[in-house]
Amino acid sequence: MRAVVVHGPGDVRVDLLPDPVPGDGEVVIAMEWGGICGSDVSYWRHGGSGTAVLKHPLVLGHEVAGRVASVGRGVTGVEVGQPVTVHPAELVSPEALPERLAGRTNLHPRVRYFGSAALHPHTDGGFSEFRAVRADQLRPLPDGVSTRRGALAEPLAVALHAVNRAGALAGRTVLVNGAGPIGALVVAAAKHRGAGTVIAADLAGPALRIAERLGADEVRNLAIGDSLPADVELVFEASGAPGALGPVLHATARGGTLVQVGNLPGEPAPAALGDLVTREITWIGSYRFVDEITDALGDLAAGLDVDPLITHTFDLDDAAAALAVAADRKSNSGKVLLRLGGEVNE
């Protein structure tokens, strides 16, 4: 089978690998679509993502969907041809979490994640024609949800987890700072979950136009002099830019809540945080998701429209070009998809 493999900084190849065979409790998926995430771009450009550094070649990709190709022994309730997506996290240790983390499996210290070099050996992702997965990682696609849209269930789950961390949204005014793919999906998720007015802010006009199509009631283009709104009760920071923290905290109302969903850099960086104290702002981190991928599929089936986010599609063999477009701010890309194989559908 063909697979998109990163070998080091700037070195991504379409390699030929053995076709997988399902083991006990496993299913092989014939992949159809994959969405490129910022971590995929980082592995390609820098040979790592965050603290995870490549030590050997890695198949990229954790935003994927396809159809069941074969079923291993002991697997029930799964049919060949069934359209599915994948929960990309797999616990690899029986270590119990402390009580304060009950149910928060996204915070378990021993998790294998599709397309991640965090553990050794690394965990290959799903940018390949076939991938064997544990049956309990499958999430069947509801009727009416194509595999193309199903590939966006994982990033939508990240957005939904952030929304869940914020509490009830009904009728609230919400600011989303950073309208890249995750920020845009936070806009869509917040609006779908009943937020009143949703304001999106970014430095890029094309990203803001996508955010409008996903439900933003107002947009602020910071590159042309627009300012952030004042005294917003609930703010999502999705840019991950340390320089944005001061202005975003200042835009948060006294006693308000700031949900940090954009990954911040691991190295020290200057940031103006005084308002965090003087305004008694509740600053909440949001990391990946628990099982909001199931909720994401339900929302997609209920009409949450993610299509405006998809701006580019490439064939698997053109993965290097796809990564370059996803990495290039001048490309005005939203979500870049790879056609991985099968009878792909729009």
Regions found by a protein language model. Give the residues of each.
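C-terminal hydrophobic helical "lid"/dimerization subdomain
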Residues: 1-3, 246, 290-346
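Glycine-rich beta-strand-centered segment in the early N-terminal region that forms part
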Residues: 20-34, 48-101, 142-144
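Glycine-rich cofactor phosphate-binding loops and adjacent beta1-alpha1 units
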Residues: 166, 209-282, 345-346
